[in-house]
Amino acid sequence: MTQTFADQKRKTVETAEFTEDGRYKRKVRSFVLRTGRLSEFQRNMMNDNWGTLGLDYQTEPFDFAKIYGNDNPVVLEIGFGMGKSLVDMAFANPDKNYLGIEVHTPGVGACIAYAVEKGVTNLRVICHDATEILRDSIADGALGGLQLFFPDPWHKAKHHKRRIVQPHFVTQVIQKLGENGFIHMATDWENYAEQMLEVLSANTDLVNTSKNGDYIPRPDFRPLTKFEARGYKLGHGVWDLYFVKK
């Protein structure tokens, strides 16, 4: 019998189906993912390919060697949007494994569809809260790197505390990084870039790779997104930060 989404590993999963409004149900914990209507195509792609491209939240660490079938380094990307740049990176770097987390279900569906189109096999995606995945599902030292590109800036000052880049988050990520693991962030909000730089620089377990001690030019290996290209044409800035674990 062909297994569909989330119907393969966890006894706590109640259903394998995504509904049209993006609701995802579990026996133990139910939550409504970020709003967004799944197209029939996206829902079918998720259900048909989740057994090979999807992972479910679990309370014990993932066995990445078993999941990917090799010992290549695992790069985690949090908040991959529609997933095009993540899939492109996985396609361009077959010597690395990629793990993407996104709570916007249409984005997950689009990412899976594009991965299938490109024939990518070194990518897995998760539809769950990133902090819980880091806490429960990833072993200490298991990651080769973390990518966080254009996270929600929460631009109002009173909402800055909601930004994902906080000292405790960085400490948690560092714990999951292996030796010489990296943290690569990018944002088009200068104020958020300054906060990222401040938080990362304050952690004594990290080294900034920038020659000037601040930002780096966009590296060639980070694909230029349509959103980013449009921003450049409008004169918007983009700031990349790349730190390495000591």
From Swiss-Prot:
GO molecular function terms listed in the Swiss-Prot or TrEMBL record: tRNA (guanine(46)-N7)-methyltransferase activity
Residues the record marks as active site: 152
E.C. numbers: 2.1.1.33
Regions crossing the membrane: none
Keywords (A to Z) from UniProt: Methyltransferase, S-adenosyl-L-methionine, Transferase, tRNA processing
Enzyme class: transferase
Binding annotation for S-adenosyl-L-methionine: 77, 102, 129, 152
S-adenosyl-L-methionine recorded as keyword: yes
One GO biological process term: RNA (guanine-N7)-methylation
GO cellular component: tRNA methyltransferase complex
Binding annotation for substrate: 156, 188, 225-228
Keyword Oxidoreductase: no
Highest taxon, organism lineage: Bacteria
Signal sequence bounds: none
Catalysis performed (reactions): guanosine(46) in tRNA + S-adenosyl-L-methionine = N(7)-methylguanosine(46) in tRNA + S-adenosyl-L-homocysteine
InterPro entries xrefs: SAM-dependent_MTases_sf, tRNA_(Gua-N-7)_MeTrfase_Trmb, tRNA_methyltr_TrmB_bact
Pathway entry: tRNA modification; N(7)-methylguanine-tRNA biosynthesis
Record's function text: Catalyzes the formation of N(7)-methylguanine at position 46 (m7G46) in tRNA.
HAMAP family: tRNA_methyltr_TrmB
Similarity field: Belongs to the class I-like SAM-binding methyltransferase superfamily. TrmB family.
Name the record gives this protein: tRNA (guanine-N(7)-)-methyltransferase
Organism for this UniProt entry: Haemophilus influenzae (strain ATCC 51907 / DSM 11121 / KW20 / Rd)
Biological classification of the source: Bacteria, Pseudomonadati, Pseudomonadota, Gammaproteobacteria, Pasteurellales
Gene encoding the protein: trmB
